[in-house]
Swiss-Prot record:
Its EC number is 4.3.2.1. Keywords: Amino-acid biosynthesis, Arginine biosynthesis, Cytoplasm, Lyase. Belongs to the lyase 1 family. Argininosuccinate lyase subfamily. InterPro entries: Arg_succ_lyase_C (IPR029419), Argininosuccinate_lyase (IPR009049), Fumarase/histidase_N (IPR024083), Fumarate_lyase_CS (IPR020557), Fumarate_lyase_fam (IPR000362), Fumarate_lyase_N (IPR022761), L-Aspartase-like (IPR008948). This is Argininosuccinate lyase. It is found in: Cytoplasm. The keyword S-adenosyl-L-methionine does not apply. It comes from Actinobacillus succinogenes (strain ATCC 55618 / DSM 22257 / CCUG 43843 / 130Z). It catalyses: 2-(N(omega)-L-arginino)succinate = fumarate + L-arginine.
């Protein structure tokens, strides 16, 4: 049943109908459409469009429909309705007859769909925040169990300074914390109810929109009807948050792929998250991580698509805005799946502690400690930086680590070096000295783990 037609003397061509209809994807808004309709039925009582008895009949029928939808949402797709709004109204009329035709009084599909997608997005935010917390928890627990695992930290993919595997884990906890708070910020901005805005100019009935917003679990009603039906900021914000978080997950995946490589051999991924080769029997490929990295592009693509869709739209509603749904549905599904898979990757990970320590001892990653040592002896840092650079060149030439050079060899470059230099060149010293807040010292890492556990509720 179409919700329009009196203006037309010919039926829509099937080719146009197939092109125009959106039920194949907006069926996912069925619950929100029904819940919004229940709220609207109550508002219509307040302006004497419906009696109390009529509203009760409608609410009963809508609740029955809600139960049916929740038990088998895919059944909706067997229908030929144009969109989810048409489908709900058609099913309601099947249940209560002509009374169902009164429900759309004062309402437009423009404010109806704006409500539906906002309600759906709000529910997704809460679910995604839980999923982000679950990955954070897995990272924190992994960090807690790997505080002893020393490894190289990198810049430019070159060994830079020693860190711990735990410190690496906690870096991603912090990235995810920002993702979590961005979701919360987006929720606050989308928590205004557009229902009652009509097609663009507002409803003709003196409905208390603040009460309607409260009934539908919004903090307030929107303030401008034209903006209310034109606004898709909440979708763009969620796509932006998802894209940035997927970039974080992609970096996590890339690190894991490198750490898992035969060249690094820092970690071993479980058989449960890897696959083999159809030709090379020895292969164990990090497919879970590669797919996380690969799926990042499609989420970012959805953001770019939505920004491009809205950039040139005149106010208010245009059919272009139907394109808002498939992108957000796919992007948030993908983000959720990747968060879940990243946590699964960590579930059985094995850290090769001996190999990470061996790698941390190479590459002169204690060179900065030597520069700081010279500064403590009164050498200006810029001079000490140059001296240590020359010392490293010499050490490379004689195939020694800095910690293996003799005092006499050190003194070729600076006469302030003495036997106490060896105390600061050990891996443990390198870690211990980074003791400012956020640093890699075991004490600070332990504090960061404890703080994160408190923040995400692991101590409960």
């Amino acid at each position: 049943m179409a919700l329009w037609g009196g203006r037309f003397t010919q039926a829509a061509d099937k080719r146009f109908k197939d092109f125009n209809d959106s039920l194949r994807f907006d069926y996912r808004l069925a619950e929100q459409d029904i819940e919004g309709s229940i709220g609207w039925s109550k508002a219509l009582v307040s302006v004497n469009i419906l009696t109390q008895d009529e509203q009760r009949q409608l609410e009963k029928a809508l609740n029955e429909l809600l139960i049916e939808v929740r038990s088998n949402p895919q059944a909706i797709l067997q229908d030929d309705a144009e969109d989810i709004h048409s489908w709900v109204e058609s099913k309601l009329i099947d249940k209560v007859g002509n009374l169902g035709k009164k429900l759309h009084t004062g309402r437009s599909r423009n404010d109806q769909v704006a409500l539906d997608i906002k309600m759906w997005c709000k529910a997704q935010v809460l679910e995604l925040q839980k999923t982000v917390r679950e990955l954070q928890a897995k990272l924190v627990l992994t960090a807690e169990n790997t505080q002893h695992a020393v490894m190289p930290g990198y810049t430019h993919l070159q060994r830079a300074q020693p860190i711990s595997f735990a410190h690496w884990c906690m870096a991603y906890v912090e990235m995810l914390e920002r993702d979590y708070t961005r979701l919360g910020d987006a929720y606050q901005r989308m928590n205004a109810c557009p229902l009652g805005s009509g097609a663009l100019a507002g409803t003709a009935y003196p409905i208390d929109r603040e009460q309607l917003a409260q009934d539908l679990d919004f903090a307030s009603a929107t303030r401008n009807s034209l903006d209310s039906v034109s606004d898709r900021d909440h979708i763009i914000e969620l796509l932006s948050t998802a894209s940035l978080s997927m970039a974080h997950l992609s970096r996590f995946a890339e690190d894991m792929i490198i750490f898992n490589s035969g060249e690094a051999d820092f970690v071993e991924l479980s058989d449960r998250v890897t696959s083999g080769s159809s030709l090379m029997p020895q292969k164990k490929n990090p497919d879970a991580c590669e797919l996380i990295r690969g799926k990042t592009g499609r989420v970012i693509g959805s953001l770019m698509g939505m920004l491009t869709t809205v950039k040139g739209l005149p106010l208010a509603y245009n059919k272009d805005m139907q394109e808002d749904k498939e992108g957000i549905f796919d992007a948030l599904d993908t983000w959720h799946d990747c968060l879940t898979m990243a946590a699964f990757v960590l579930e059985d990970i094995k850290v090769n502690v001996e190999r990470t320590r061996e790698a941390a001892l190479k590459g002169y990653s204690n060179a900065t400690e030597l520069a700081d040592y010279l500064v403590a002896k009164g050498v200006p840092f810029r001079d000490s930086h140059h001296i240590v650079g020359e010392t490293v060149v010499y050490a490379i030439k004689v195939h020694k680590g800095l910690e293996d050079l003799t005092v006499d060899e050190f003194r070729q470059f600076s006469d302030v070096v003495s036997d106490d230099v060896y105390d600061i060149l050990s891996l443990q010293s390198c870690l211990d000295k980074r003791c400012a807040k956020g640093g890699v010292s075991p004490l600070r890492v332990a504090e960061a783990i404890a703080d994160a556990k408190q923040r995400i509720g692991l101590n409960a």
